[in-house]
Amino acid sequence: MGFRVCVIVVFLGCLLLVPEKTMAQEMKRASIVIQGARRVCETDENFVCATLDWWPHDKCNYDQCPWGYSSVINMDLTRPLLTKAIKAFKPLRIRIGGSLQDQVIYDVGNLKTPCRPFQKMNSGLFGFSKGCLHMKRWDELNSFLTATGAVVTFGLNALRGRHKLRGKAWGGAWDHINTQDFLNYTVSKGYVIDSWEFGNELSGSGVGASVSAELYGKDLIVLKDVINKVYKNSWLHKPILVAPGGFYEQQWYTKLLEISGPSVVDVVTHHIYNLGSGNDPALVKKIMDPSYLSQVSKTFKDVNQTIQEHGPWASPWVGESGGAYNSGGRHVSDTFIDSFWYLDQLGMSARHNTKVYCRQTLVGGFYGLLEKGTFVPNPDYYSALLWHRLMGKGVLAVQTDGPPQLRVYAHCSKGRAGVTLLLINLSNQSDFTVSVSNGINVVLNAESRKKKSLLDTLKRPFSWIGSKASDGYLNREEYHLTPENGVLRSKTMVLNGKSLKPTATGDIPSLEPVLRSVNSPLNVLPLSMSFIVLPNFDASACS
C-alpha cells in the first residue's frame, strides 16, 4: 500500500545576508534512510504550544522594554488578527504562566489581602510586587480562549503562604485556599481547562525563588486532592496536573517524583533557554553552529530517562522555551534566522519523547510569534503553523550520510498516511540533492544536475503549482521558506516566492504548496526551509 510523505527541509548558514554567488557554490548529495516500520515515540496531538506571560508593560532588560501591552492582564483581546492567528491552528495549545505567576493572587473567595496590579518593587521577586487576577478579566480571557478554540494550560501560584528562608530558598506549607476558590469559580462558570500547572521555575536552585523537592512533592499531593474534589461532581473533564515548570536538575526532579508518588503528576515540565542571554553578541553564531545546537539534546534525553525510571506514569513537556532568556534577542528572536533554532528544537525534543513544546511567547518580548501591538506574525509563527499542520504524532528513526550541518528528523504525516522529514542544513554554501529510502527501496533518487544560479534554482521547484502534475503521475508537495531579500534577519518569511503577510482583509495568508513529480530531483538550497510531501513511501508505522 502506498503512503504519502512530507519532508521539511531547513537550511542554515553563518551569514546574515548571503549574496547569490555565495549560495550554491557546492553541489553535494545526501542519502536519507527512514525507518518506517515502527514509531520510536509519539508526541501529543497538539505538540506546538505558545505561552502568554504576566509581565507588565514596564518589564525591561538591557535598557529595552519589549513587552508593551501583551500580557495576560493587559493585552487587547478584541483584536481580530490575534484571534485569527490562534484560530489558524485549529487548535493551538496556550500555556498561561511565567516568572510572576507565583506572585498572582486570585480575586475570589474570602481574600484577606488587597488585590492590586503588579508594581515595580526592588524587594519583590523579579523586581515586582504581588499582582492580581480579577475574575472579570478571567471571564474575558475565557471568552477569548473559547472563541479561538485554544487548549489551555494555566500556571498556578505555588508560593502562596510560604515565606523566604535564606537566599532564594522558600519554606513553609503552601496555602491552597485561594487556589481552591479560583478553581471552584472556574468550574462554576464552565470554563474548560486542559491542565493546571503548579509553580514556575522553583525547582532545584531556582531562578527568583526555590522550593525543596520534598515540600513541592507534598504540595502536589494536596493540589491533586483539590482538583479531584473540585471536579468530582462537574460535567467538565478533569484537567491533568502539570509540574514543576523549572530548569532540570536530576536529583531534584527525581526526589519530586518519589515524594509525590504514582499518578499524582501527569506531566513533568522543564524549561529550555539554551541560547543564553538575549544580549549575547554570539547569539547568531550559536544558532548557526550544529555542535552547539546539539548540546541540549542531553537535557531532553536526561529528562525523559528520569521520568521513565522514577515516574513512568508521567510525560515530559517543554513548558517554556524562548531560545534566549530575558525577553529574547532583539533583531534575532523575531526574525527569519530564529526559525533555524526553533524548528531544530521541535524536531530534537520530539525525538526524545517530548509530548508538548511551549514557545515563549505567543505575544510579548522579542521572542513572540506575533508582534506586540500589531499582532502581525513573525517568521517563527509560520514555522510553528506549518509544523502543526504537517507533522504528525509518530516519530520515526532516520539516518543520513550527509555532513554534520545536515540535520534530519522524521515524523508520520498529520491527518494522512505518510512520513514527514525535517532536514536542517547549517551550511551557507552547500546545495544538496537528496535521495530518500526506507532502507530497502530508494523512493527518491539523487540525480545529478548542472550548477545553476540562485534564480534558476528557485524557479524550478516552483514550476508546478496545482493539485495534479501535468503528466498525471503522483506528486510531492513542496513548501519552500526563505527570508525576504535573502536577509536572514528579515522579519518577513517568504513561502514559494511569495511574502507571507496578513491579507488585505486582515486574514492569515494561505500556506499553499507547489507540486512536483515524485520522480524529479529533490534539491535543497542553503539557508532555506522546505516542507516536501512524497507519495508511495513504505512506512507501515504511519498507515
UniProtKB/Swiss-Prot annotation:
GO molecular-function terms, A-Z: beta-glucuronidase activity
TM stretches of this protein: none
GO terms under cellular component: extracellular region; lysosomal membrane; plant-type cell wall; plasma membrane
Catalytic residues (UniProt): 201 (proton donor), 320 (nucleophile)
Entry EC no(s): 3.2.-.-
Keywords: Glycoprotein, Hydrolase, Lysosome, Membrane, Secreted, Signal
Location in the cell: Lysosome membrane; Secreted
Endpoints of the signal sequence: 1-24
Any Pfam family the entry gives: Glyco_hydro_79n
Sites where a glycan is attached: 184, 304, 425, 428
Classification via InterPro entries: Glyco_hydro_79 (IPR005199), Glycoside_hydrolase_SF (IPR017853)
Family annotation (PANTHER family): HEPARANASE-LIKE PROTEIN 1 (PTHR14363:SF21), HEPARANASE-RELATED (PTHR14363)
Official protein name in the record: Heparanase-like protein 1
Species assigned in the record: Arabidopsis thaliana
